[in-house]
From Swiss-Prot:
Multifunctional RNA-binding protein that recognizes the K-turn motif in ribosomal RNA, the RNA component of RNase P, box H/ACA, box C/D and box C'/D' sRNAs. GO terms for molecular function: ribonuclease P activity; rRNA binding; structural constituent of ribosome. Part of the 50S ribosomal subunit. Probably part of the RNase P complex. Keywords: Cytoplasm, Ribonucleoprotein, Ribosomal protein, RNA-binding, rRNA-binding, tRNA processing. It is found in: Cytoplasm. This is Large ribosomal subunit protein eL8. It comes from Methanosarcina mazei (strain ATCC BAA-159 / DSM 3647 / Goe1 / Go1 / JCM 11833 / OCM 88) (Methanosarcina frisia).
Length: 120
C-alpha cells in the first residue's frame, strides 16, 4: 500500500482552501477529478491543487504531490473527500480538484500558497 508523502496542514488553512475552492468554482474555473487535475498540473494551469487524504487505494492520488512539486503548483491535503466533493459543487466525493482560474479567489489562493510554502 502506498503512503502519501504529505505534510500536516492546520485546519484553519484547509478551511480557507475549501472556501477559496467554492469561490473559484463560482467565479473562475476548476477541474474536478484526479485525471482532469493531473492534466491541469501538467499543462502548468493549476493555481492550487486540493487532494483528499482519505482516498483508498492511495495510489490513485500518490502522483499528484510530486507532480505538483515538479510543476511548481501549490497543493494542499484535505482530510475528507466528501468535503472536497461538496466544495467543488459535486453531490459525491472527489479525490482531487485543481483550480485553473481563480476568479475572485486569486488573492486568497496567493495567501494560501505562501502559507503552504512555509509549512514544507
Amino acid at each position: 500500500m502506498a503512503q502519501l508523502a504529505k505534510f500536516d496542514v492546520p485546519e484553519e488553512l484547509t478551511n480557507k482552501a475549501l472556501e477559496a475552492l467554492e469561490l473559484a468554482r463560482d467565479t473562475g474555473k476548476i477541474k474536478k477529478g484526479t485525471n482532469e487535475a493531473t492534466k491541469a498540473i501538467e499543462r502548468g494551469n493549476a493555481k492550487l491543487v486540493l487532494i483528499a487524504e482519505d482516498i483508498e487505494p492511495a495510489e490513485i492520488v500518490a502522483h499528484i504531490g510530486p507532480l505538483s512539486e515538479e510543476k511548481k503548483a501549490p497543493y494542499i491535503y484535505i482530510k475528507n473527500q466528501k468535503d472536497l466533493g461538496a466544495a467543488s459543487g459535486l453531490g459525491v466525493s472527489c479525490a482531487t480538484v485543481a483550480i485553473v482560474d481563480a476568479g475572485k479567489a486569486a488573492e486568497m489562493i496567493q495567501d494560501i500558497a505562501q502559507k503552504l510554502d512555509a509549512l514544507k
